[in-house]
Amino acid sequence: QGKNLTQAMGATNFISTIKGKSENTLTSTPDEELLKMLRDKLSKDSFETNIRLVVSAENKIRSESIFLEMANSFVQFSSNKTNSFKLVRTKKGAFDELIYKYSFRLFDESQKNVLGIEELTSIFHFPTPLTKTPNISGVKSKVSAPPTNIPKEGLLLGYNIYREEKKDIYIKKDDRRRHMYIIGQTGTGKSSLLSSMALQDIKNGEGIGMLDPHGDLIDDILSKMPEERIEDIVLFDPTNLERSIGLNMLEYDPRFPEQKTFIVNEMINILDKLYDLRQTGGPMFEQYARNALMLLMDDPNEIYTLMEIPKVLADDNFRKRLLSKCKNFLVKEFWEKQAEQAGGEGALRNMVPYITSKFDNFISNDYMRSIIGQTKSTFNFREIIDSKKVFLVNLSKGRLGELNSSLLGLIITSKLSLAAFSRVDIPEDQRNDFYLYMDEFQNFATNTISTVLSEARKYRLSLIISHQFIAQLPEGIRDAVFGNVGTIASFRVGAEDAKFLEKEFEPIFNSQDLMNIDNFNFYIKMMIDGQTSKPFNIKTYPPKKGDYKLANDIKEYYSLTYARSRYIIDEEIRRRRVDI
């Protein structure tokens, strides 16, 4: 299907024409199918082309026969509704000119045809990777021009080159508040983009949090840390066996007693995320765990930790002492009239190992015990957000194990969300922006992420979340992400993900493009001034080299200044368990 195709052999040409269309037909109500075809063609790259056929043979009869076979092959492109090709005889005087233009590949404006990529590949079959054709370079994936209203300033994501015009691509602060989702296979450049974005925020004086399940991203950021922001660093590195940072999940702000309910609900969600409570827990587990947590948090004089959960269940004296100070009548009623009175399989003594087994993995682990066993967290999450700190969290699964890494990440995500929501006590226009980067975020997301994504904007908590493939996400989290995220970026993905993402990027890009885009390139559907843009492509700038001695110096300084000796912490935990 072409606009105006001319072909030649000797004195013979092709032209394209619309056949059999009366004036009434062309001016009547538009054909929906035809309009769809027009829109489809206009949405893709097109090229001005000349197409010429030249045949050389041992005699005229043979050359004419070959030519007619070639000419007849264009009949397949004819359509009653769209363009067709028609054979036209060329005058003798034009023959030499035609051969000359063919020989030197000279473009003839008078015979140009506007053909789309699909039309060109239907007429001429380009070489495949299996075809040995020298001096031919191929394009594995399409490119597209950025929108005309692309911001001139903001956070730099990379650059776009379209028809030899290079343009830097920025995203505005307000558009970032609608969150950003990044997907791509390992090694495609996601970490490079995250590092670039985070370092720009740091240099601009913004507050950021970075949850890194591998540790490499944290090292990269520390190695490039601006000198003026070193004092703003809050480094959480649980992989240090000698010195520990404290993180108490049960700690809350007394000014906001409603936080207790949020913490308990999040703790249940975290356990469900880690153990799939539908299969391994059930309503009895949730009931006992919920009331044990509420009982510990209702003591007005003491701060407890997850270490005391087994003691609530197994130590009658300890539980009775807590109940004597408990003001929550529902919690008291559960323990005094249900749990302690139950018999048979539901008896409290039978429930103890059932409940505590879910906590033993953390309590008995050398890495975890000295972190979650401290009554006071080393840092204040609200202060981290309000004071624009650089909060870096090394959750290396290789050192901690996947379960412990996930638990700490889930607790920290919950704490940051709670701190952000507590900013209801200050006017919205006085809330500082805080950017939370989460690599492999599926490890740190519970079902409440839909609430975070929908509500965090007003509290100035902006999420940048990334992972490798969609199957990592439970259906509820997947729907929450694609239903609430404003900006979607896709590096190269596999076949299944390409099919899923195609609907986000069509008609500009298809699944083949998503599967074949080069490393350090990505497709993006970006939020611009509160509106979703048409998809286009971006290439990231190459990362600069860092100073890893600086990174190690920062880690050592922070460990000596803020972390505590594990020996001292273990001794405190031992004494506390004896005293209570």
Regions found by a protein language model. Give the residues of each.
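An aromatic-glycine-centered, glycine-rich loop/turn in mixed alpha/beta architecture
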Residues: 20, 41-163, 364-366, 519
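Short, flexible, solvent-exposed loop/turn segments with mixed acidic/basic and small polar residues
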Residues: 39-47, 196-201, 478-481
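Short cationic amphipathic helices and targeting signals
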Residues: 49-56, 208-210, 488-491
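Conserved ATP-driven motor cores of ASCE-family P-loop NTPases powering translocation/secretion/packaging/pilus
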Residues: 73-80, 105, 110-115, 223-225, ...
